[in-house]
Amino acid sequence: MQGSLSWLLRFVEGQQLSSLPRQSHRITMLAGLSVLNLFPLAALEVGQQWYWEIGNLKLHGQTFATSWFVILLLVIASLAATRNVQRVPSGIQNLMEYVLEFLRDLARNQLGEKEYRPWLPFIGTLFLFIFVSNWSGALLPWKLIHIPDGAELAAPTNDINTTVALALLTSLAYFYAGLRKKGLGYFANYVQPIPVLLPIKILEDFTKPLSLSFRLFGNILADELVVAVLVLLVPLLVPLPLMALGLFTSAIQALVFATLAGAYIHEAIESEGEEH
């Protein structure tokens, strides 16, 4: 790699660029930016991991650490809100009751009055974990905490493994909901209204978790990268509006994920001709 960069630099100094293809132009521009320290590409490298080795398994240590931190925040907030329950709520109890009411309305709107109660804890947990994870990446200075192997802490949802795990949990949830409600008759949905739709219905079972996971991962990663680039280039007040926009989009992503999870579960349990 060093030989390639040295060759590019010598080429820039002593030769013409006209004979190089467009791809070489791009590589030369990026190498020049890196040499001039205007844009430290290595600081934005994605994929440096702090591994925890358990037997033959390698786990992403920073993802587990930040996930446990988010879970701890949620547990502390729940305990603080329920420690001294008042008839007239105030403070954090008032906030948590508002959040509970919001989550209840979200689950009811997706699943209906009769079916939403058993699934409220699942949908609510999804929303709260994703919401707090996203906001932790936007508000907390994770990168100031030094960890081994040169890795950097980030929001749990900044790791594709986290978003895939959440999406697979959602898939298991709507399979379980359908089988619990309809038994083996659930699989009749794959050939309705006509059997020729069977391949498409099977394909949907793969595309649903893929779309859920990559949508969440892509939005959170892109937001953090854009803010990091702007902070490097214009480290004053310019990135602040974009950071505020990032907080808004992070909340929207949590809402979208929880809403789609509820919609998929409702699709699995609804009967033919049943109104939502």
Swiss-Prot record:
GO terms for molecular function: proton-transporting ATP synthase activity, rotational mechanism. Its main location: membrane. It is found in: Cellular thylakoid membrane. The keyword Thylakoid applies. It is a multi-pass membrane protein. Keywords: ATP synthesis, CF(0), Hydrogen ion transport, Ion transport, Membrane, Thylakoid, Transmembrane, Transmembrane helix, Transport. It comes from the Bacteria. SUPFAM superfamilies: F1F0 ATP synthase subunit A. GO terms for cellular component: plasma membrane-derived thylakoid membrane; proton-transporting ATP synthase complex. NCBIfam families: ATP_synt_6_or_A (TIGR01131). F-type ATPases have 2 components, CF(1) - the catalytic core - and CF(0) - the membrane proton channel. CF(1) has five subunits: alpha(3), beta(3), gamma(1), delta(1), epsilon(1). CF(0) has four main subunits: a, b, b' and c. Belongs to the ATPase A chain family. This is ATP synthase subunit a. It comes from Synechocystis sp. (strain ATCC 27184 / PCC 6803 / Kazusa).
